[in-house]
Regions:
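Polytopic transmembrane helical bundles with strong interfacial aromatic enrichment
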Residues: 2-353
Length: 353
């Protein structure tokens, strides 16, 4: 990564204000991570449809009076989720789910504010300019698009006869968050101090594959969450007694393409298989880096990533066996983003040297 023509080494030796850009980008990544965890809690507590309107500005204020709470509750009562799932819910219970969704949206507003203020400050101070400024601005625009995607996802759960958001739109929402998080970490990492380590192209390609498979695994995990596939087939290593379920189970839904979204057998099977593939590729990459780049920070990063993936796999298996209790579901989602962050930082550091 260059800063309007500066090399990574020159960035490190540039004035202190330039290094504040790196700290700010890592702060943005931490906020996105927090947003993902709060979003996971919002989903797991069934709170995502409690606010039935999208009002980016005025929606920042929660109900402040009994009358305002009653009005918000009546709006929730008008959607199918209340009538088909939560009929008879008390106002206190509604407030519980409302606060989760409101907090999720409020955190999104805070992220936008921190990004906007930080971007303006760094541009005015001269720390951000040229291609780097344009690139970072693009990340901000992705964040704005993410807010719109979030509302499209919520709106998919407000339709008649529907009690939850569409799995494919949940996948899009989480994958966009993962993409923004990845790019923030990669840009910030590449602005760090070079270590003088030269990575072969084969190592860089393998690290890219690990990063891609991690993103894919998160996307497939979102489909598991959206289709509630984690609440069924709660056994491991077998799925309903099969290592590989028969075709009549994997493709029981018509048309064929819908099996990849709505068939809980295939959705969970895909998530399992991609996890095995990710672990295998990470192990191979760890061996590769150990052979080609021994006694380097790259070797340490690749090894750490393997162990993080192993821990995440164990958490995933336990989460499945216990049918996704709240705390385990949150831990599994948070751990996935820790793995992703490590994979992104590792890949970016290989470019930095």
């Amino acid at each position: 990564m260059t800063h309007d023509g500066f090399s990574a080494s020159e960035i490190w030796h540039a004035p202190q204000r330039l290094r504040t850009v790196r700290i700010w980008l890592f702060l943005m990544a931490a906020l996105v991570f927090t947003m993902v965890v709060v979003g996971g809690a919002t989903r797991l507590t069934g709170s995502g449809l409690s606010i039935t309107e999208w009002n980016p500005i005025m929606g920042a204020l929660p109900p402040l009076t009994d009358a305002a709470w009653a009005e918000a509750f009546e709006k929730y009562k008008a959607i199918p989720q209340y009538r088909l799932v939560n009929e008879g819910m008390a106002l206190a219970d509604f407030k519980f789910i409302f606060w989760w969704e409101w907090s999720h949206r409020q955190l999104g507003r805070a992220i936008g504010l921190v990004f906007g203020m930080g971007f303006l400050w760094n541009v005015v101070s001269g720390a951000l300019r040229g291609r780097l400024a344009i690139y970072v601005l693009g990340l901000g625009l992705l964040g704005g698009a993410q807010g719109t995607i979030g509302w499209i996802m919520v709106a998919s759960g407000l339709k008649e006869g529907v009690t939850a958001v569409a799995p494919i739109k949940l996948m899009l929402h989480l994958t966009m968050a993962a993409t923004i998080y990845t790019l923030l970490i990669m840009v910030a990492t590449r602005m760090g101090k070079p270590r003088g380590e030269i990575a072969p192209q084969s190592v860089k390609r393998a690290a890219s594959l690990v990063l891609f498979l991690t993103l894919l695994q998160i996307a497939l995990g979102a489909l598991v969450a959206g289709s509630k596939a984690g609440l069924v087939w709660n056994t491991w290593p077998f799925l309903d007694g099969h290592l590989v379920p028969p075709a009549e189970m994997l493709f029981s839904v018509s048309p064929l393409i819908e099996n990849f979204v709505d068939n809980t057998v295939l959705v969970q099977f895909n998530h399992r298989m991609s996890a095995y593939l990710l672990l295998a590729v990470a192990l191979w990459h760890g061996w590769q880096v150990g052979r080609l780049m021994p006694h380097t920070s790259a070797n340490r990063r690749a090894s750490i990533n393997v162990w993080l993936i192993v821990v995440q796999a164990v958490i995933g298996i336990i989460t499945l066996l216990y049918a996704v209790p709240l705390w385990l579901g949150l831990l599994h989602q948070a751990s996935a983003f820790i793995v992703l962050g490590m994979a992104a930082a590792h890949r970016a550091a290989l470019v930095r040297g």
